[in-house]
Design a protein with these regions (language model features):
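Thiamine diphosphate
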Residues: 1-58, 64-87
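Active-site-proximal beta-alpha loop/turn segments in soluble metabolic enzymes
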Residues: 63-64, 157
């Protein structure tokens, strides 16, 4: 991510919990990425691999935006929305679905092809992301310490990015709907 690569990962339950410290950093640095999560229960008094949202809900405070799906077709379509929106919004996404029924369902779906999605990528936002990448040719300092006054001001300035997310997601849902004929 810091090198300007577009990335995503796939995980569930305890694996997602191990990522929480990194999620704060990713969101705080406005690095676009998507975590695809097969939402499952967390181990408590016994081990259980059935679906609930306990793992996903434990990440709400990290700064990631969230999209949820209820069918395998929605997983296909809205994964595209998540990837497109994270680039434009600069906000990372958790894209999640039921970790038992949906993740194990065998169903015919209509695939979105790369050729369908490529024209939807905000090329300017992608170029800006890559221009901020760490590289030996353009060294920068990141992750410095701040006093409370500047830290608070910087955190408040982040709100404009989050306020833009719903409109960006809606825009891409409409564009995906135009391609697929399915309304989101």
């Amino acid at each position: 991510l810091q090198a300007g690569a577009l990335t995503s990962t796939y995980t569930a339950s305890q694996g997602l919990l191990l990522m929480i410290p990194n999620m704060y950093k990713i969101a705080g640095e406005f690095l676009p990425c998507v975590f695809h999560v097969s939402a499952r229960t967390l181990a408590s008094h016994s081990l259980c691999s059935f679906g609930d949202h306990r793992d996903v809900m434990s990440t709400r405070q990290t700064g990631f935006a969230m999209l949820a799906e209820g069918s395998v077709q929605e997983v296909m379509d809205l994964a595209g929305v998540a990837h497109l929106a994270t680039i434009k919004a600069r906000v990372p996404f958790v894209n999640f679905f039921d970790g038992f029924r949906t993740s194990h369902e065998i169903q015919k779906i209509e695939m979105l092809e790369n050729e369908d999605l490529a024209p939807l990528i905000d090329q300017q936002a992608l170029a800006e992301f890559r221009s901020r990448a760490l590289t030996p040719e353009k060294p920068v300092a990141r992750g410095m310490a701040e006093n409370p006054d500047t830290f608070f001001a910087h955190r408040e300035s982040c709100n404009t990015y989050y306020e833009a997310v719903p409109a960006i997601v809606e825009e891409y849902m409409e564009k995906i709907s135009e391609i697929t004929g399915r309304k989101y």
